[in-house]
Swiss-Prot record:
Subunit structure as annotated in this protein's UniProt entry: Component of the CTF18-RFC complex, which consists of CTF18, CTF8, DCC1, RFC2, RFC3, RFC4 and RFC5.
Note: Present with 1660 molecules/cell in log phase SD medium.
Family, as annotated: Belongs to the DCC1 family.
Alphabetically ordered keywords of this record: DNA replication
Species whose genome carries this gene: Saccharomyces cerevisiae (strain ATCC 204508 / S288c)
Functional summary from the UniProt entry: Component of the RFC-like complex CTF18-RFC which is required for efficient establishment of chromosome cohesion during S-phase and may load or unload POL30/PCNA. During a clamp loading circle, the RFC:clamp complex binds to DNA and the recognition of the double-stranded/single-stranded junction stimulates ATP hydrolysis by RFC. The complex presumably provides bipartite ATP sites in which one subunit supplies a catalytic site for hydrolysis of ATP bound to the neighboring subunit. Dissociation of RFC from the clamp leaves the clamp encircling DNA.
Gene assigned in the entry: DCC1
UniProt name for this protein: Sister chromatid cohesion protein DCC1
Disulfide bond listed as a keyword: no
Coiled-coil region list: none
Upper taxonomic lineage: Eukaryota, Fungi, Dikarya, Ascomycota, Saccharomycotina
GO cellular component entries: chromatin; chromosome, centromeric region; Ctf18 RFC-like complex
Top-rank taxon, per record: Eukaryota
Example GO biological process: DNA replication
Length: 380
């Protein structure tokens, strides 16, 4: 099989070549999905360009190469082409003519990544009465009114964006998209649990209307910050929406809620000081609404604490730790000379950017050994 190749190329920067993975090719060939593919970036100059489907995001990386890549198309010559068949060296006659019309020195590689929300214009809501007035005074900041508008301007797929929005406690207040502060989110969760239990609502089948009504019955003040949208935000973060239910209902994630209360207890009682674990467990339990049905264990708070001694606990904020792996291990071993493998993993996993096996990653900076049924990690 052979073709006649004609060439009249010029370098044309308007053409961009993108490597298509098998998954991307399948999406392009699927009429149901291909219209959902979008190119996005945060701005025109500095941000990386990403390609988004309905549920995934790929970052584009430009790769220059020394070879010349020709862009070609089929064409019909004005005059028939004649040639000496002996020059074919036994190949069949050319069956078509193509012409190289442009050339490029680079192509874009697609790598799957985690999409991100653009939260630059999204304010924090702390339950204050004058929230709308504060927003109106921020004349230089664009106000975003809907989640669809936020997703349109964020380098992420729709499904990833919605999931992240629920995870961070995204909501709407007075027609403005906002994020609930950690303090207000904790208050809203506590009020929701207290009200739902007082009204004997089924914690495994909550709906927004009944829950909002139950919360409203307990608010005597004229100003009630716990709007329907706020209640839905709390349910989206701390519960799972039942897909098969006839009505929209949510099932509370009891272990996750217990962990959330535990993190608040760490910050409140053992931030900067240590406390016996048994005493801390009592204080943790005291934060829950009376008779809230959950079990607690210090292991639920891995990644948020260290143990100065075998029987004491103290809060640690991962955001304050160095991002350099070597320095982070040094800091962790200053806080605690010997770590159980399961306790240290949540504190160092984010640094394993190459996706190595966690044991291999740890061995680069520390020692690990078996002590009975446990694996412990110590400094070199």
């Amino acid at each position: 099989m052979s073709i006649n190749l004609h060439s009249a190329p010029e370098y044309d920067p308007s053409y961009k070549l993108i490597q298509l993975t098998p998954e991307l090719l399948d999406i392009i060939q699927d009429p149901v999905q291909n219209h959902q593919l979008r190119f996005k970036s945060l701005d025109k100059d500095k941000s990386e360009v990403v390609l988004c489907s309905h549920d995934k995001t790929w970052v584009l990386k430009q790769r220059k190469h020394s070879n010349t890549v020709l862009l070609m198309r089929e064409f019909v010559p004005e005059q028939p082409i004649t040639f000496d068949e002996t020059l074919l060296f036994g190949l069949s006659k050319p069956y078509m003519d193509v012409v190289g019309f442009a050339k490029t020195e680079s192509e874009f590689e697609t790598r799957e990544t985690h999409g991100e929300l653009n939260l630059n214009s999204v304010p924090i809501y702390n339950g204050e009465l004058d929230f709308s007035d504060k927003i109106m005074k921020r004349s230089s900041t664009k106000v975003i009114g809907t989640l669809e508008e936020l997703l349109e301007n964020s380098p992420c797929s729709a499904l990833e964006g919605i999931s992240k929005w629920h995870k961070i406690g995204g909501s709407v207040k007075d027609g403005v998209l906002c994020i609930l502060s950690q303090d207000f989110l904790f208050k809203a969760l506590h009020v929701l649990l207290m009200s739902a239990m007082a009204e004997s609502l089924d914690l495994q089948h909550l709906n927004v209307e009944d829950t909002h009504h139950a919360v409203g019955k307990d608010i005597e003040d004229e100003f009630n910050p716990y709007t329907r949208e706020i209640i839905e935000t709390v349910l989206n973060k701390f519960a799972v929406q039942e897909q098969e239910a006839e009505n929209n209902t949510w099932r509370l994630r009891i272990p996750f809620i217990a962990q959330w209360y535990g993190i608040q207890a760490l910050r409140k009682y053992v931030s900067g000081i240590s406390m016996p674990i048994d005493e801390f467990l009592i204080k943790w339990k005291s934060l829950f609404p009376p008779f809230f049905p959950c079990d607690i264990d210090i292991d639920m708070l891995r990644g948020y604490h260290f143990k100065p001694t075998d029987k004491t606990v103290q809060y640690i904020a991962k955001s304050t730790l160095p991002m350099d792996p070597k320095e982070r291990f040094k800091v962790l071993f200053r806080l605690q000379s010997q770590w159980d493998l399961e306790d240290i993993k949540p504190l160092i996993e984010e640094l394993n950017s190459r996706g190595m096996k966690i044991d291999s990653f740890i061995m680069k900076y520390a020692r690990r050994k078996r002590l009975g049924k446990k694996t412990v990690v110590t400094s070199r």
